[in-house]
Regions:
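Solvent-exposed interaction patches of small proteins and small membrane subunits
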Residues: 1-145
Length: 145
């Protein structure tokens, strides 16, 4: 029996959807405060995908990831996401290092360009995960799966 905390996964997916809505709802990212907001929205979007990916991997007792890229590879191998989506996520992953470790030298043009070019993978991720969970565990019930 698998232990997949659907409630926690759904909470993170809802948060991701909110973050993406905020990002797409704002069209002018010029200015210090706007740049900081964009940085946070992008970082938490990336972290949401990684956290949900880890929860799915742990819950279904898939192989242990050794890196962030490995999380994406496992999700692709297990057919949670397509190869196309995996490629898009891997293009965005280096932004996390820029935001978390190289935060003094963030290239905002690159940040916006790379994330915007690959945002569709993030927008589709919640439904891909929900569909995977439903196919593997069945529909949500009153009991925790």
């Amino acid at each position: 029996m698998y232990f997949v905390d659907r409630q926690k996964i759904e909470q993170i997916l809802g948060f991701l959807e909110k973050q993406l809505g905020l990002f797409e709802g704002h069209d002018n990212w010029d200015g210090d405060l706007s740049e900081l907001i964009a940085e946070r929205l992008i970082q938490t979007s990336i972290d949401s995908v990684l956290d949900v990916g880890n929860a799915v991997i742990d819950g279904f007792i898939m192989r242990d990831p050794g890196s962030y890229e490995d999380i994406i590879d496992i999700l692709q191998d297990e057919k949670v996401i397509s190869e196309e989506k995996a490629i898009q996520f891997k293009k965005v992953l280096p932004l996390r290092k820029m935001l978390v470790q190289d935060f003094i030298e963030v290239n905002h043009e690159e940040l916006h360009a790379v994330f915007s070019e690959n945002i569709e993978a993030f927008k589709q991720f919640p439904d891909l995960v929900r569909n995977y969970l439903t196919n593997e565990l069945g529909p949500v019930s009153a009991f925790k799966n």
